[in-house]
From Swiss-Prot:
GO terms for molecular function: GTP binding; GTPase activity; translation elongation factor activity. It comes from Tropheryma whipplei (strain Twist) (Whipple's bacillus). Gene3D superfamilies: 3.30.230.10, 3.30.70.240, Elongation Factor G (Translational Gtpase), domain 3, P-loop containing nucleotide triphosphate hydrolases, Translation factors. The keyword Nucleotide-binding applies. HAMAP family: EF_G_EF_2_B. Belongs to the TRAFAC class translation factor GTPase superfamily. Classic translation factor GTPase family. EF-G/EF-2 subfamily. This is Elongation factor G. Residues 10-290 form the tr-type G domain. One of its GO terms (biological process) is ribosome disassembly. The lineage of its organism: Bacteria, Bacillati, Actinomycetota, Actinomycetes, Micrococcales. One of its GO terms (cellular component) is cytoplasm. Keywords: Cytoplasm, Elongation factor, GTP-binding, Nucleotide-binding, Protein biosynthesis. Coiled coil: none annotated. Catalyzes the GTP-dependent ribosomal translocation step during translation elongation. During this step, the ribosome changes from the pre-translocational (PRE) to the post-translocational (POST) state as the newly formed A-site-bound peptidyl-tRNA and P-site-bound deacylated tRNA move to the P and E sites, respectively. Catalyzes the coordinated movement of the two tRNA molecules, the mRNA and conformational changes in the ribosome. PANTHER family: RIBOSOME-RELEASING FACTOR 2, MITOCHONDRIAL, TRANSLATION ELONGATION FACTOR G-RELATED.
Amino acid sequence: MSQEVLEDLAKVRNIGIMAHIDAGKTTTTERILFYTGITHKIGEVHDGAAAMDWMAQEQERGITITSAATTCFWGGNQINIIDTPGHVDFTVEVERSLRVLDGAVAVFDGKEGVEPQSETVWRQADKYKVPRICFVNKMDKIGADFHFTVKTVVDRLGATPLVIQLPIGSESTFEGVIDLVEMRALTWRGDAKGDVKMGAEYAVEPIPEDLKQQADEFRQKLIETVAENDEALLEKFFSGEEITVAELKSAIRRLTVSGSLYPILCGSSFKNRGVQPMLDAVVDYLPSPLDVPPVTGVDADNPQERLADVSQPFSALAFKVAVHPFFGRLTYIRVYSGTLPAGSQIVNSTKSRKERFGKVFQMHSNKENPVPKMSAGHIYAVIGLKYTTTGDTLCDQDNPIILESMTFPDPVIEVAIEPKTKADQEKLSLAIQRLAEEDPTFKTEQNPETGQTVIKGMGELHLDILVDRMRREFNVEANVGTPQVAYRETIRRTVEKHEYTHKKQTGGAGQFARVIITLEPLEVTGEKTYDFVDTVTGGRIPKEYIPSVDAGIRDAMQVGVLAGYPTVGIKATLVDGAYHDVDSSEMAFRIAGSQAFKEASRRADPTLLEPIMSVEVRTPDEYMGDVIGDLNSRRGHIQSMQDSSGIKVIQARVPLSEMFGYIGDLRSKTSGRAVYSMTFDGYAEAPKSVTEEVVRKARGE
């Protein structure tokens, strides 16, 4: 089959593989590439040679950090795969890949079931309404339990699973699956070391006698579940007619695409069993670009949509920028509509800049296959885009549209970084600029007082890897400080009608602005941390100056009155004020707004907020007391404790400032047998002792 891009979109699948760390996601992707004939020797993550893990650190750490996009062919269909990382510090990668996928394969560990990170990724996929099929991997592992894993999909994700395969054998005797749709057994029989043919061939057999009864029960359940959700089949089901395989498949497809059900398959990627049927399921049940609702523009006054069709005007979303060793900036884009040859000029409608595409590639991990043009429904990597960053829309100059972008969380941890020599200084700023283009959750700023460069990210591992990349890719030698917590400030009390007058009379034009503001605490939500209300009547402050007061307050909120951290949770009401015909200006009102806020917030009982992390620890029973005692000593609140296949799962909320270096302590307390994961949960008021300590440090006492 030629490697050209398929024009028939019904035969195209854009999918992601999502999972918890170590559920076997990269291995699964490797097997897919092997069976679809792109990689000749299977890369094993165990020896650090997987084709998808192409950054040096990924190969060392055995975890996937960047989502490499890969194209492969299966049975006349084209599958574009985006491999996503499962480590919580890399949520941004998962978030951006889900935004451009049409469907996903959720890989679960057959022994652990749904783990905390699988849950986070699952919720992100819910947010973008991505249809999914589930693959229960590692069925050859000791303690693997298919039915337990299916139960965790119900209990922890609240999803409706649809079991379409059952395992034949388990642990070391796992040798195949029962296909409940076509009622047959698929077996991969090899020698004890695993088949020399890499499991590329499998036998289709009748279902073994000892499993027939179980298979019949599950087949009945499968048909009932599908019929309940699909009217066409419901009538047939009640009238006792035979439902054909084709009818069952198309009903499962409809329900999967609409997100009502999640088909569940099983296998062992490492032992090369069960991967081909999973590829068949990707083609059979996951949506093509034609099954997905058309994309719409975000401009409410001018609603527009684009269908996945080459005859429509061109539109695409940039979802990743990577730095390539030869080509420089490589931008990954998902084309939603239209077609364009390489070298065309387009508009970046998000930034209102003209751009030109250079060469266009379909990627295989980090090898490029050049293609002459881009067309709807596909994923490409392009070079030549100068201004485009993650989340920008690219479109036809005459038919502009802006597509929904992605939301990225604010960083929660920061470290100061200093170049070791003068020569490193320039390299450092280039490295930071390049890395920030690639990763929107990586922020950087100059500390005005110390002149230090501060880098911010989503966790210790995230920053470690970024500093590591600076060293490897940009040869920057730098000293890194200890991690600091990104605190916030807020107010606890309402201050009514605080007045501030800004005036300056020094010959020539003076400056004059009077404002009266009321400050109230505002509940902080993900989207809203500040609200500005204007209740000035009778033109006491001319309309054109009011945005300046708002801007002044925003300026002042950047540096809080307690310890200089950004202020959140403020509702500011501009009640009244006064102006002068000659001396008032936007600048004067901006200064007045800023100073009024500073004075009022000092009176409003300011307090410090600290980031709280949601921590989940999985530990063997005998260490449970130590682990809980340790979490309590870190000011943690234990939320729940559960049993999960011989392991205790502890959920707690712990302040981030207490979690530095936790991994080392946990390892030594549990002889390396416990694991933990941590996600940002929100901000909470810091206790008095912590606030005093932070304020003292900030004031340099």
